């Protein structure tokens, strides 16, 4: 042990030295105690605790930063911090041996969730299968969809008549009785783990229901519990807040405060009047909410979706969005999960423009959220569907491609929520597009009110005063499939299915984790029955929150049905994505210029594989004016195809691939129906350097890797093997290493590929319309 001078007054004040060994205030050295080999700890902190060695090691890794951030946020409240540490150990001890083994496996393979084999599915438990036991019974179907990431929408206890779809939680320790119990949740998670699937659950951290125990005691006048919310005796301070805080629901729930009759005070309610904002400036709130999160992790939840993340810190005179303290809180929660349950990931819900989304990843050294939603790309995609003009989407993808490979986005077409038009209007100004009339055009088109549109959506939270509204509807209905079936128009049905499949192909081309909204795999349509329910009628989001139609799901096996055509096509695309390393997150990605504003063209390169992906957002035939000199093969059919002046049918796509330093081998997918392609000869491609493709923005891996990284990569197969070992023959979801994939290619003989059953493109019976120009509002 190395003893040096220590300032007792500084220690009493809780001031930290941030690991330098010198107090930044009094410049006096701290006293250190040797711990293990190279780790030092301040004497009297936690090394004397009778805690598990693994927990101590993990806590030691984060202790200095954790205490510094906590003390800065909570004014050196040592008692609250000590409670926080004790609470973390309590949940570490309660964690099952099985989950602890999962933690160790995932620590050995920290990028386990970044593989190109990851596919998510988002669902409401009651809509999909009635309850948690019902979901468990349908795991075979979920697995048949290729899903290994199951996201269950809010299922914790909430008042039936004031639940906001489960986002008004009255008890974070109980499941809604009609959905099951916490034991049912743990059993479902255990079954998912056995199948190599992970479970995601929403954690509503910004607010509670007014029926929560804390809220009830606050209503009763208990000051301690009123301090966990934002209570004010009159409207003076709330009025000051209102000057700078935007309204979330200006039409249906105006303002950010509500009068609480029982308490005789004003309370902050950013969302709905029955959802009370939590005061995270109170350390008791942070400690107890973190404990609630860790409790969910101990019931087998692998991914915690942090709902309404940007809103959780409030300060008068600010917008109460994206404040620096929010990032401190998320960073502390990230470290807490790494100490207690390092197999758990944080998914941030940040529904804002890209410049405000990306900071929630944190930094490489100090990460915050492991994953974030790619909200802007989703909205830009539907903008492109309505305008048939890819320029905004191309601009958006360039911004995404410029980000580091370490950032993992969840990509999706539709989800439980509405489509908000938070587009880059500064960029659109150069094309003469103004925000308000453009939003009206988008909403009109996707409701079928514009000329040539067969989309069927509904407005949500319409604000005529501002000319603003958001949009609801399922993917299939927005693609025109609902209208085509209603009209019994087979030509329109082909076109709608073609658009639906093309959009999913674009989704699967992006780096990150693609997530399906349950029902989209069979083209489920809008559910208008919500209009008849007095509780749901005012919320048009229930239009796309209908019950899973299991009779229709059975039609996925009936050749020629809408369900069969979409299901089979998506499974084909998902299996191809999982097979080829070019879809890995580490791939270089760039935009290709096709000299046609109706076609989006994307390039990907990784591990000797180069992919060109083309997407025609026009309903008419279009040509991508490219001139690539390599030999390419269609990944869906195995046919050789030149990447020169490619003519594409309306609402179609192409995945063309070539390889360098190895022959192209068409992978087989036995689960899919295949038709043989005759007279195809696969020739070895001469080894060549990666060509300088035309691109505007590229995500480049470092040319030279540090020696430490190379050593880590050399050990990667062993790490993967360790990650795969788990009790009771349970299976983790890990990626193939590049070395393993290269070995598979080497061992596989070069042979002519069996052709895939091609994704069905529309075969118009009606004459094609004249070539279109970008639509004006």
Where are these regions (language model features)?
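Intrinsically disordered, low-complexity regions enriched in Ser/Pro/Gly/Gln/His and often acidic
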Residues: 12, 16-19, 44, 648, ...
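Positively charged N-terminal leader segments that act as targeting/secretion signals
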Residues: 5-27, 31
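Intrinsically disordered, polybasic Lys/Arg-rich low-complexity tracts
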Residues: 674, 678-777
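Intrinsically disordered, low-complexity, compositionally biased regions/tails
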Residues: 18, 23-28, 642, 755, ...
